[in-house]
């Protein structure tokens, strides 16, 4: 299977973290001794998670357990991409996806207590940026969806009521935060939050084209940004988002 966006000097393995064959045979053949594991590869869709419960089980539970076990056995740090859904009105219980991400944070922290696992937990907020339009499964981030709809000359579809607010972070800022979280020699949590917060209606208006409201989605809820953790993240990582959402949209 051809892998898109393939980089030079990088070895790709087309497998699943839930697959024992990957851990016991494929990875062993590489004789690979990593310094860190950036665990970013999980099932990451909110609404479909009510249907795709088996995928959630395999990817977010079995898969992440295998990654955590690997890091424990190798005595290396795991940098985990948690979800901002944990910081919501329902405390991360509003969907199977959100619940799985919250439980994985607990798993990692407990492995640190029980076995000395080194970790950095990072919370993502609506990433956007280059190549976001390469995803074609229908459940992209809202900025990517709006970009595709605008290029196709279609009205933007806004999930009702449209007044719900979201914070947006450019992928380059997120990557910068991930690297700094790895380099900091502490077990800690970090909110990689951009400086652009707006309602979905306000976001649509930035695209300067027609839009329409569609029905509410199951599992969506109001995010609560913990300002103390945001300020703490900026301080201890010496990190701050530098990209602007409006500037990105204007270039499309």
Predicted segments, located by residue:
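Hydrophobic alpha-helical packing elements
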Residues: 22, 26, 56, 100, ...
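A general structural signal for well-ordered alpha-helical segments in protein cores
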Residues: 64, 143-144, 200, 204
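Residue-level signal for the nucleotide or nucleotide-sugar donor/cofactor binding architecture
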Residues: 18, 51, 59-62, 95, ...
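NAD(P)-dependent short-chain dehydrogenase/reductase
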Residues: 96-98, 106-166, 171-176, 182, ...
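N-terminal Rossmann-like NAD(P)+-binding domain of SDR-like oxidoreductases, especially those catalyzing
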Residues: 1-127
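C-terminal substrate-binding subdomain of Rossmann-fold SDR/epimerase-dehydratase oxidoreductases
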Residues: 150-252
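Short beta-loop-alpha junction of Rossmann-like oxidoreductase domains
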Residues: 90, 130-133, 201
């Amino acid at each position: 299977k051809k892998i898109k966006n393939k980089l030079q000097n990088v070895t790709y393995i087309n497998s699943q973290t839930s697959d024992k064959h990957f851990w016991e045979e494929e990875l062993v053949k590489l004789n690979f001794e990593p310094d860190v594991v950036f665990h970013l590869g999980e099932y990451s869709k909110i609404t479909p998670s009510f249907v795709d419960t088996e995928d959630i089980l395999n990817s977010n539970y079995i898969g992440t357990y295998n990654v955590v076990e690997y890091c424990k056995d190798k005595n290396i740090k795991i940098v985990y991409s948690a979800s901002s859904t944990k910081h919501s009105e329902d405390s991360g219980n509003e969907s199977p996806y959100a619940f799985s991400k919250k439980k994985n944070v607990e798993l990692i922290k407990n492995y640190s207590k029980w076995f000395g696992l080194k970790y950095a937990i990072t919370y993502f907020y609506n990433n956007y940026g280059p190549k976001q339009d390469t995803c074609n499964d229908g459940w992209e981030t809202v900025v990517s969806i709006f970009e595709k709809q605008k290029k196709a000359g279609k009205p933007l579809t806004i999930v009702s009521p449209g007044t719900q607010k979201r914070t947006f972070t450019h992928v380059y800022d997120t990557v910068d935060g991930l690297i700094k979280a790895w380099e900091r020699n502490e077990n800690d949590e970090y909110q990689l939050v951009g400086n652009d917060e707006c309602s979905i209606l306000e976001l649509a208006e930035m695209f300067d084209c027609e839009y329409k409201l569609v029905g509410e989605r199951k599992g969506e809820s109001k995010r609560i940004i913990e300002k103390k953790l945001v300020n703490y993240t900026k301080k201890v990582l010496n990190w701050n988002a530098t990209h602007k959402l409006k500037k990105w949209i204007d270039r499309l």
